[in-house]
Amino acid sequence: MLMQIADFEIGLNNPLFLIAGPCVIESEALVMDVAGELKSITQQLDMPFIFKASFDKANRSSHLSYRGPGIEKGLTILEKVKKTLEVPIITDVHEDTPLQEVAAVVDVLQTPAFLCRQSNFIRSVAACGKPVNIKKGQFLAPWEMKQVVAKAWATGNKKIMVCERGYSFGYNNLISDMRALAILRETACPVIFDATHSVQLPGGHGTSSGGQRKFVPVLARAATAAGIAGIFMETHPDPDRALSDGPNSWPLAKMQPLLETLKELDKVVKNAGFLEQSSE
């Protein structure tokens, strides 16, 4: 299934596209700098790009952790990025988010992994009519996403993506099963792989999550070789000082060489026709 986002199409057999940006809006300056650099990199690589940043991280480990600037200031900043840099925007929404207000600004709505089984929420987000990126819960088998997608499609909105972001494996740990990407393709939706949250160690630092950043390229390459429509990566100029998800964010300065590799892998896989639409 092909899906129009801004001025490009995404799909399982289309060239790899990128969703990237900082985990949370820390400041207007940082967001503009990161978005500008990512636009420059993706233009050089001729890679479709959607900028991602959150105005409210509602599921932080601690109530003392930074959540973001809030919806009013956050949407103002995201709208500036969109208009100034002319890039499409994706941001996550929650059960208490005024959805139409967000949908009026961004190009894609994203549902958090923890909320993928909340039927009313999924239907409400899909009913906005915008493209939706549904993140698969860490607790969910990949074949269960067919039912989640069906809930969204029931609203009449077929512009649905599904995003793999790892599986809970014991306490404070996630693993990635690349077979899941082939299974998720059976939904007929564009499949996204979240290479940075997949290396997260949820709650690993007690009051915050840890992460194994060094494995981001390993999983990103593996997922691209397995066959995906897009790659999702949170990035920051100085991940060790990021206000959210720093341990699993990929350094902005290292984005271009990694994306160059992923682009070449994607070409090999798709030109050879390796993307099975069924696991049968």
Swiss-Prot record:
A cellular-component GO term for this protein: cytoplasm
Pfam families named among the record's database cross-references: DAHP_synth_1
Domain of life: Bacteria
Coarse class of the protein's main subcellular location: cytoplasm
Signal peptide: none
GO MF entries: 3-deoxy-8-phosphooctulonate synthase activity
Pathway: Carbohydrate biosynthesis; 3-deoxy-D-manno-octulosonate biosynthesis; 3-deoxy-D-manno-octulosonate from D-ribulose 5-phosphate: step 2/3; Bacterial outer membrane biogenesis; lipopolysaccharide biosynthesis
Enzyme Commission number(s): 2.5.1.55
Keywords: Cytoplasm, Lipopolysaccharide biosynthesis, Transferase
Catalysed reactions, semicolon-separated: D-arabinose 5-phosphate + phosphoenolpyruvate + H2O = 3-deoxy-alpha-D-manno-2-octulosonate-8-phosphate + phosphate
GO process terms (BP): keto-3-deoxy-D-manno-octulosonic acid biosynthetic process
InterPro entries: Aldolase_TIM, DAHP1/KDSA, KDO8P_synthase
Subcellular location(s) per record: Cytoplasm
Enzyme class: transferase
UniProt similarity note: Belongs to the KdsA family.
Entry-linked HAMAP family: KDO8P_synth
Protein name as it appears in the record: 2-dehydro-3-deoxyphosphooctonate aldolase
Source organism of the structure: Coxiella burnetii (strain Dugway 5J108-111)
